[in-house]
Design a protein with these regions (language model features):
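ATP/pyrophosphate-binding catalytic subdomain of soluble kinases
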Residues: 1-53
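ATP/nucleoside-binding phosphotransfer catalytic cores, i.e., glycine-rich phosphate-binding loops
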Residues: 58-125
Length: 125
C-alpha cells in the first residue's frame, strides 16, 4: 500500500463510461506538457465503456514540506480500494460530475473508500 499526504484541488475518478469528459481533458494537458518539455510520449488512455477499472488523477497536487505529489495518477482494479482521508477543517466536499447540488461533506477525519461497484452503467443512445 502506498500512503501519501497531499494538498490538491481534488481528485478526478473516471469509469470507462466516463473517460470521454474531464479525464480526457486532463490527459490532453499532460500530453501537451510532456511535449513542451520534451519528456517523451504520453499515450492516449481510452478504455471501453464496459472497462472494469477506475482511473484517477489528482488535480493540481502541491508539494511542500508536509505534503507530497508522487501518487498523482493510477488505476483501481477489481477488488481494490482507493482510500482517501480528509484533512480539510471545513468545506471539504465529494460530488459527482461537477454537480454540487448532490454533494456530500468530506471534512477532517472522514474516510472514503472507492472501488468498483457491482452495478454497471449503461449508455443509451
Amino acid at each position: 500500500d502506498v500512503v501519501e499526504n497531499q494538498s490538491s484541488s481534488g481528485i478526478i475518478i473516471s469509469t470507462g463510461l466516463g473517460m470521454t469528459g474531464w479525464h480526457k481533458s486532463i490527459m490532453a494537458e499532460f500530453r501537451g506538457m510532456a511535449k513542451a518539455f520534451n519528456l517523451g510520449f504520453v499515450p492516449e488512455v481510452e478504455k471501453g465503456w464496459d472497462c472494469r477499472e477506475l482511473t484517477f488523477q489528482v488535480r493540481e497536487p502541491y508539494p511542500s514540506r508536509f505534503t507530497q505529489a508522487e501518487l498523482v495518477y493510477g488505476q483501481i482494479h477489481e477488488r481494490e480500494k482507493l482510500t482517501l482521508v480528509s484533512d480539510m477543517a471545513e468545506s471539504g466536499v465529494i460530488f459527482s460530475d461537477g454537480i454540487l447540488d448532490d454533494s456530500l461533506d468530506f471534512n477532517a477525519g472522514m474516510e472514503l473508500k472507492i472501488g468498483i461497484a457491482d452495478r454497471v452503467g449503461r449508455l443509451v443512445v
